[in-house]
Regions:
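A short helix->loop->beta-strand "cap" motif at the edges of active sites that frequently abuts
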Residues: 80-87, 115, 159
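Conserved phosphate/ATP/ADP-binding segment of small-molecule kinases
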Residues: 99-176
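Single conserved hydrophobic/aromatic residue that forms the stacking wall/gate
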Residues: 182-195
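Active-site cofactor/substrate anionic-group-binding motifs, chiefly glycine-
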Residues: 37-80
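Glycine/charged-rich beta-loop-alpha catalytic/anionic-binding loops adjacent to active sites
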Residues: 11-16, 173-184
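Anion (oxyanion) recognition and catalysis
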Residues: 34, 82, 155
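Glycine-rich phosphate/adenosyl-contacting loop at the front of the ribokinase-like
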Residues: 1-42
Length: 195
């Protein structure tokens, strides 16, 4: 499948991309959106979430640097997007890092239906109630079957799941693809992952 047609559509439509991002990646996310032809807005204030989300072509929710206001903003933006059939992408960064973060992300998922969820193996395990071992936002667990985690999470959430790792996985609950989306493991990483 080629990505040239969707990219051409984005460039022609120049959609507003509403990103509730973390402070670590906000600049990168904005620049990436600009590079593909979207128009990013990195609004954070809960008071304007419904208005901004209603104008967006897509909404991205990242929980990397959470606080109560960001979770309130994410719930409002996501619910508004759902009501208007605007796709929502959720990146539940570090979902297993603390009980508070896990509870807030579970609450978010009760109120917002994402089209896509991007996770690592530890985050997927946490969302599936399997514990998941994380060090900050990095997955420490190397499950023997990350494909099973991706497929189970896609079925549970009813959306596409992108699971990053040595091999990146895309699952929709019925189909599973393995690819290298972003990661480019070194030979040392490949050797380590087999141990």
């Amino acid at each position: 499948m080629s990505v040239s047609a969707p990219l051409a559509a984005i460039r022609a439509q120049h959609p507003l991309l509403h990103c509730i991002s973390n402070i670590v990646s906000a600049n990168d996310c904005a620049n990436l959106a600009l590079a593909i032809g979207a128009s990013p807005i990195m609004a954070q204030a809960p008071q304007e979430m419904a208005d901004i989300a209603a104008l967006a072509g897509a909404v991205v929710l990242n929980t990397g640097t959470p606080d109560e206001a960001k979770f309130t903003a994410a719930r409002t933006a996501g619910a508004t997007a759902n009501r208007r059939s605007i796709p929502v992408v959720l990146d539940p960064v570090g979902v297993g890092a603390s009980p508070w973060r896990l509870a807030n992300i579970q609450n978010l998922l009760q109120q917002v239906q994402p089209a896509i969820v991007r996770v690592n193996a530890g985050e997927a395990a946490a969302l599936l109630g399997l514990g998941g071992s994380e060090h900050g936002v990095d997955s420490l667990t190397a499950p023997k079957a990350p494909a099973g985690l991706a497929a189970a999470l896609a079925q549970k959430l009813g959306c596409v799941v992108l699971l990053s790792g040595t091999e990146d996985l895309i699952a929709d609950g019925q189909l599973l693809c393995t690819c290298l989306l972003y990661t480019s493991p070194s030979p040392r990483d490949r050797q380590t992952s087999r141990m």
